[in-house]
Amino acid sequence: MIISHKYKFLFIGLPFSASSAISKELHLQYGGEPYLRKHSLYHEFENVATKSELEYFVFAVLRNPMEIAVTVYEKMKANTKGNFTNPELFSENGGHITKLHRERFNYIKDNNSSFQQYFKKFHKKPYDNLSSLTIDNCDFVIKYETIAEDYLLALKKAGVSNPKPLPVANKTAGKKNDLLSYYTNDIKEISIAVFGPFLKKYNYSFPEEWGVVKIPLKSKLEFLVLGVLRKLNQKYFKKTKSNISLDGTIYGDMQRN
């Protein structure tokens, strides 16, 4: 989370949605300061913000979850930065890599798993993420798919004149551009059940090649119920982790400067 008192804006950084690149640029160019944790949510900000800060312009990035699932798989498969094998990042040590993350990582590594095998094993419930706890509190939402244009528009709406383009950073190693190379016919129906409710809620579409799709009623109901439970858990039961990120990370270095 990045706050700028100069321009009176708050950026809520969501995982796998260019939060590092945007946070760094807001810090370097627009007086942005780290606030709480990298992926803190709006209700956490509300608990500590001043009355004037609650009036700040709020924005975040929304990304197609089909893309996010592929990105997560490729990051685990490559483990380029060693995140999934670094004990300092494990949740029991105050980090963000949970036991579930490590279970998925080990499954991919031990079985040389394809995306389709991984998806069948770990994606069984309707997909949801922190966007559902964030977007309703935003004054503007950047779509990841049009991030270059939307980023500039967000800054203009926040009162920045002549904002600079966002540098491209943090591309996922090994990731292919064609979604259909991942979402093959053998996981098409599962994908519709898993992603359908989220895509419909945020006006995303399945690949055109799939034609007209029907989202199962069971998935729609599960998505609604699990969404309510998720909000209650995040707001009232989830333990807050350390506000300080690791030294050597983009957010951690900003916090220490």
Where in this protein do the model-derived segments appear?
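Membrane-interface amphipathic segments in extracytoplasmic regions
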Residues: M1-N257
